């Protein structure tokens, strides 16, 4: 019988998070160490998570004793753009549980984060992973690693049957599956199998711990929170995306050059993504809306600015599987470079298992609301309808309701 899919402890170390959390955390340390933020948890499909509150609290409390050890620190020191002062700070960092509020409210599990951005930023990914795994081990207590592994090999067989050798040589796929994974053990097994046997090009993982353990590349640049926070960090709202991109450029000097486009909408983003940014950033990340139509806008924008699209890369990360990735790859091949970050479909695709639809999103920065509109109406998120309406007015975004 194969090994259980579950470990007693869900999050084992500080690096069991997405790489862009560390890159943004460094940016916060250097630029906004005094910013205060609030976050709220949402279960999009209304699943009743109240029975798991005790187990979630138990795993949450165990985050408080996590520290960075010498081996993990040595791994991070090899990443040139992580600066010595940030690594010293991370060596001293501890999760402060007084910034986390969890309980039952309105007959639902509620979870809120409130505190300094610098000290709250690392909570998101492990908290979501904890909620997902606690739920899964209650619903599927006898799940074995072999079931996840067998499902992944079936996907490899499908890909070999449907893609040519030339296509496989160019098809770049990464693991972006930490936050809604079935379990930590399943994600590690999936990433190990991808590294060893993926028929295309496996280019890395967003999970820093697995990158360290399995000797592969950690991947990620920025998340929505980086751009959202700038809506309340000082500049005029109309200049907030420009301020976010400009701060990133000053922090990383041309490295980590994949920009996220859908905090407001792709059209609003391209209005701010001028020749300066288009030359400095290596490419763009898609996270909502129809992917090929989005890519056509990106290609046209680069061409309008006199930039060869084949010098740039588009990263796709919105609810992908291998089938959809191959379709997008074929639609854009030879016109612009593409790469695919696949999450839940790699780390929580097991027969008989329904993945969770959960998010933990920033709602406020420095006491005022922030918003994500996105290129997909269902992904719009803000606690203040008036602020969303104001943002739509400022950026000339029509309402999709």
UniProtKB/Swiss-Prot annotation:
Catalytic activity: nicotinate + 5-phospho-alpha-D-ribose 1-diphosphate + ATP + H2O = nicotinate beta-D-ribonucleotide + ADP + phosphate + diphosphate
Keywords: Ligase, Phosphoprotein, Pyridine nucleotide biosynthesis
Record Pfam families: NAPRTase (PF04095), NAPRTase_N (PF17767)
Superkingdom to which the source organism belongs: Bacteria
Enzyme class: ligase
InterPro entries with a match to the protein in the record: N/Namide_PRibTrfase (IPR041525), NAPRTase_N (IPR040727), Nic_PRibTrfase (IPR006406), Nic_PRibTrfase-Fam (IPR007229), Nicotinate_pribotase-like_C (IPR036068)
GO CC terms in record: cytosol
Cross-referenced CDD domains: PncB_like
Pathway this chain belongs to: Cofactor biosynthesis; NAD(+) biosynthesis; nicotinate D-ribonucleotide from nicotinate: step 1/1
Any one GO molecular-function label of the UniProt entry: nicotinate phosphoribosyltransferase activity
Positions bearing Phosphohistidine: 224
Post-translational modification (record): Transiently phosphorylated on a His residue during the reaction cycle. Phosphorylation strongly increases the affinity for substrates and increases the rate of nicotinate D-ribonucleotide production. Dephosphorylation regenerates the low-affinity form of the enzyme, leading to product release.
EC number: 6.3.4.21
Protein's GO biological process: NAD biosynthetic process via the salvage pathway
Family: Belongs to the NAPRTase family.
Free-text function comment from the UniProt entry: Catalyzes the synthesis of beta-nicotinate D-ribonucleotide from nicotinate and 5-phospho-D-ribose 1-phosphate at the expense of ATP.
Alphabetical list of NCBIfam families matching this protein: NAPRTase, PRK05321.1
Protein name (record): Nicotinate phosphoribosyltransferase
